[in-house]
Regions:
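Conserved helicase motor core of P-loop NTPases
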Residues: 1-137, 143-146
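A contiguous, basic/glycine-rich beta-loop/short-helix subdomain that forms a polymer-engagement track
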Residues: 133, 140, 181-185
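Glycine-centered loop/turn motifs
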Residues: 134, 150-153
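Hydrophobic alpha-helix feature that most strongly marks membrane-spanning transmembrane helices
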Residues: 111, 115, 142, 161, ...
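Flexible loop/turn segments at secondary-structure boundaries
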Residues: 3-5, 99-102, 145-147, 162-165, ...
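Extended aliphatic helical segments
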Residues: 69-70, 114, 137-138, 148, ...
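C-terminal accessory regions
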Residues: 152-222
Length: 222
């Protein structure tokens, strides 16, 4: 694990690998950990019957504050993390692509929140997906013609709506010109699957764990 010697991520990961249950602090009950350098936190968005008054949920549950796991994820991505940590390199990791709470739906939710349609903002629609200026995207197959490969993540710098072309800037500061046919190889990347993230590094990761992912919830996922 590429972390500092005092990283909680390392100790928690070793416990999980050994089948032990780590005791991970929650910022809902210990808000000071947002500022004290703690690098791994756990926020519970379940436990208990839904539909109760917020005040009846435990203090450590996000439901007490009116936020289920999707809204909590959105709030963390858009607002809370940037409030305490100066980073834009935030990645949501999801075990599954296709489900009610898979990467496709979470990407649509985050895109609508951080990069909605606006007057003067170019966008292009390709089948069931819409890309806009400023969107975070991931290339999904190897494309040797433009030298972009499976798992490369970048940001759309500009879109030409008439021709269906775009310019995308990747992490190594390369700007690549995409034809419309190349755009078909892209997906939104606010949320990506854990599988797609292998080999990548991020300043901050949000990892929602929900019962809908039950067939993927094994120790080695964490």
């Amino acid at each position: 694990f590429r972390q500092g010697q005092e990283s909680k991520i390392i100790s928690y990961a070793h416990k999980i690998n050994h089948g032990e249950h780590p005791s991970i602090n929650s910022p809902l009950t210990e808000p000071q950990i947002w500022k004290d350098g703690t690098d791994c936190m756990f926020i519970d968005s379940g436990l208990g019957e839904h539909g109760k008054p917020n005040s009846e949920y435990p203090q450590w549950s996000s439901l007490r504050y009116g936020m289920d796991v999707v809204n909590m994820t959105k709030s963390l991505y858009i607002d809370i993390i940037n409030k305490y940590h100066n980073t834009k390199d935030i990645q949501i990791l999801i075990p599954m692509k296709i489900s009610d709470l898979g990467t496709i739906r979470i990407n649509d939710i985050i895109q609508e929140a951080v990069n909605p349609p606006a007057k003067g903002k170019s966008q292009i629609k390709l089948k069931d997906r819409t890309f806009r200026d400023g969107d975070k995207v991931i290339h999904t197959i190897n494309n040797y013609d433009i030298e972009v490969f499976n798992g490369d993540i970048g940001w759309i710098q500009s879109i030409e709506e008439v021709s269906g072309t775009a310019e995308i800037k990747f992490g190594d500061d390369r700007v690549v010109k995409y034809k419309k046919i190349d755009m078909m190889e892209l997906e939104l990347a606010y949320a990506i699957t854990c599988h797609k993230s292998q080999g990548s590094e991020f300043d901050c990761v949000i990892l929602p764990i929900m019962s809908q992912y039950s067939r993927m919830l094994y120790r080695n996922l964490l």
